[in-house]
């Protein structure tokens, strides 16, 4: 078992590829269709994360669909209509599933507690590890991100530990500002606008 939510997403995609599924257009509800005459701005929010993408993720420990900006384009958003691509990343990493992901340091249990890291669908505790900077940069490049928000800074600030991986090397910082500076400098070549959020409010 891969540790998915077991809510039936993969069987739905299997039906689609086998051409036996029900298309959304067949059960159209006009009341919920965006009125083209409004010409408003649309913010598309993707679920899950880059490394769960069916093509770019850690296969087979992936979801059944596309978690990249390509998923929006595949579903009818014209590429030229996209003005900004926002990336949202935790300043540490989490994962729910059957593969071994969490490090052996007991501090990860503390991060899980402070960050309330439990699966949104199943309530399972998320495995926690330090930010993989190489993977982050890959996600930025593949998606063409031009605006990047790091959240959960408040969690690391509360436990007073700021670490990340760059390749096989772990970098340990003495304060939050040092970690933020390092990340900002290392991402200069991507020309991405970066915001570090320590907002504790629930969304």
Name every feature range the model reports, one short phrase each.
Residues 1-203:
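Non-transmembrane, aqueous-exposed alpha-helical and coiled segments at domain scale
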């Amino acid at each position: 078992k891969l540790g998915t939510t077991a809510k039936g997403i993969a069987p739905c995609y299997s039906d689609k590829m086998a051409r036996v599924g029900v298309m959304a257009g067949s059960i159209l509800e006009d009341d919920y269709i965006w009125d083209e005459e409004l010409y408003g701005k649309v913010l598309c929010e993707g679920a899950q994360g880059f490394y769960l993408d069916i093509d770019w993720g850690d296969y087979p420990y992936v979801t059944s669909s596309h978690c990249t900006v390509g998923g929006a384009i595949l579903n009818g958003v014209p590429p030229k209509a996209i003005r900004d691509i926002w990336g949202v990343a935790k300043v540490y990493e989490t994962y729910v599933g059957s593969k071994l992901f969490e490090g052996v340091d007991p501090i990860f249990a503390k991060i899980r507690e402070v960050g309330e890291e439990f699966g949104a669908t199943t309530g399972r505790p998320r495995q926690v590890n330090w930010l993989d900077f190489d993977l982050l940069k890959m996600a930025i490049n593949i998606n063409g991100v031009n605006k990047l928000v790091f959240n959960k800074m408040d969690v690391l600030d509360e436990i007073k530990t700021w670490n990340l991986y760059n390749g096989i090397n772990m970098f340990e910082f003495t304060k939050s500002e040092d970690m933020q500076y390092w990340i900002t400098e290392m991402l200069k070549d991507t020309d991405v606008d970066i915001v570090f959020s320590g907002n504790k409010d629930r969304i």
